[in-house]
Amino acid sequence: MWKYGQNQGNQGPSSGGGGGGGPNMMPMGGFGMQHGNMQQMHMSPQHQQQQQQMGMMGGPGSMQMNPQGPGGPGGLMPGMSPQHQMQQQQQQQMMQQQMMVPQQGVGVGVGMGGGVGMGGGGVVPQQQQQQPQQNMPQQNIPQQQQQLNPVAGIPPGGAGGSNNMLAISQQNPHKEINIVQLSRLGQETVQDIASRFQEVFASLKGIQPTSHRENSSEKKVQEYFRTIRLLFKRVRIIYEKCNDAGMDYMSAESLIPYRDEPEPRIEPSLCDEYRKVLQENHELIETVKLKNRQLREIIDRTRIIIWEINTMLAMRRS
């Protein structure tokens, strides 16, 4: 770009119709380049990229304004007097100096435009060019933020969205309750309660029995007790959920069989027909027992009779 400005400055005198525009504005371009380079040394890489983009936009804009004046540097009208042309050039130089002082990064673009050469007709387009250059940093800032957000992996409002997702996942009522997880949570809560009590004892041990009590220590102990109360409530809720989700409590002694104690018999459920049949069975059993008793008596009497008959036969023979 610097060589291009030098070539355009050197071509200024050769063109007919006024040769003072290009060479006079060339030092301004050089000053703009030096001023912009000195300021870029103290800037971050992002600001330097923005300045380079703005300079590239400023350069072509000024290059397009050169063809306005035929036969000479851009903006010099052929029918104007030399004094009027010199006044226009001085006005342009003053405006360029004013633009270079407040806008540090615009010096590169202005220097390039001066190197190419701008005439009196380029004052209004130069102001129009200044407005998009001022709007460029405002447009680049959201673009850089959009580029940084995907790299970081956190969209705008990402923290709030993750917290909402956690709250929804914790408050999901359709999720199955796992007794093992509840038991583990209850165990951690009990350990937390024990650690809180240790902190309470340590804080109470550090308090000295003086007439003036410190409000900070009292507030600290009260905060500990409030936290312990909440932890006990949590343990109670976990205990109720475990009992509701688990099976009924059975003592260990009832599950261990002992040899000395008789095994309990499980009575089946009895219906009416079964009861009737069972009653008939009992009656038949009683009847059979009675018949057996009677048969036994008959057998005993028959045996006695046989013994008596045998005795009588033996006595007759003798």
Curated annotation (Swiss-Prot):
What are the start and end residues of every segment in region (Disordered)?
Answer: 1-92, 120-142
Keyword Zinc assigned to the entry: answer is: no
Coiled-coil positions: none
A GO CC annotation recorded here is: mediator complex
The record's listing under InterPro entries reads: Mediator_Med30_met
Q: Where does this protein reside within or beyond the cell?
A: Nucleus
Q: Which domain of life is it from?
A: Eukaryota
Mention one GO molecular function.
transcription coregulator activity
Q: Which GO terms describe its biological process?
A: positive regulation of DNA-templated transcription; regulation of transcription by RNA polymerase II
Pfam families in alphabetical order:
Med30
- Keyword Metal-binding in record: no
Task: Output compositional bias ranges, type Low complexity.
Answer: 1-13, 34-55, 78-92, 124-142
Give residue spans, biased composition: Gly residues: 14-33
What keywords tag this UniProt record? Activator, Nucleus, Transcription, Transcription regulation
**What is the annotated role of this protein in its UniProt record?**
Component of the Mediator complex, a coactivator involved in the regulated transcription of nearly all RNA polymerase II-dependent genes. Mediator functions as a bridge to convey information from gene-specific regulatory proteins to the basal RNA polymerase II transcription machinery. Mediator is recruited to promoters by direct interactions with regulatory proteins and serves as a scaffold for the assembly of a functional preinitiation complex with RNA polymerase II and the general transcription factors.
> So what family is this one in?
Belongs to the Mediator complex subunit 30 family.
* Subunit structure comment from the entry: Component of the Mediator complex, which includes at least CDK8, MED4, MED6, MED11, MED14, MED17, MED18, MED20, MED21, MED22, MED27, MED28, MED30 and MED31.
According to UniProt, the name of this protein is: Mediator of RNA polymerase II transcription subunit 30
Q: Which organism is it from?
A: Drosophila melanogaster (Fruit fly)
